[in-house]
């Protein structure tokens, strides 16, 4: 899929901005798709339950959500019954053109989790999931406004803050 608009069309979501979208997977039509390559950045929040994980000497239940980060050109299995793609969750899709010329565009390489393997996905707690969902909501609220000369800057800053929180959440995995 080359554009965010094409992604929206494939998943049955409305395009509010040509370069960025927040997609509710519980409302998405996954029936006609299998493996799809995205030509844009994709953050996938799966709200499907998973097992408790051991960090340090304790078990922590981070089954409230899992984050997967895809760089442009990466593929994911979109089969509805696939363990790789959830039927409940959210996608934040943003094209590299959105962040071009922004601080996020200059620093996107610092968010190394975009090059991690699927088994290195970030398992998050309920509190962390709420933070991610708040940013998804803020981005979506901005997308529901008419596009103006401030839209790109505001949306890219929200995405950058979301990614900064994700760095914090990844680092938490190695502290606990």
What do the predicted segments below correspond to?
Residues 22, 43, 67-69, 91-93:
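Conserved hydrophobic/aromatic beta-strand scaffold that supports enzyme active sites
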Residues 130-176:
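An amphipathic alpha-helical interaction segment
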Residues 50, 68, 73-79, 99-100:
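Histidine-centered metal-chelating micro-motifs
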Residues 57-71:
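Short acidic-glycine-tyrosine-enriched beta hairpin
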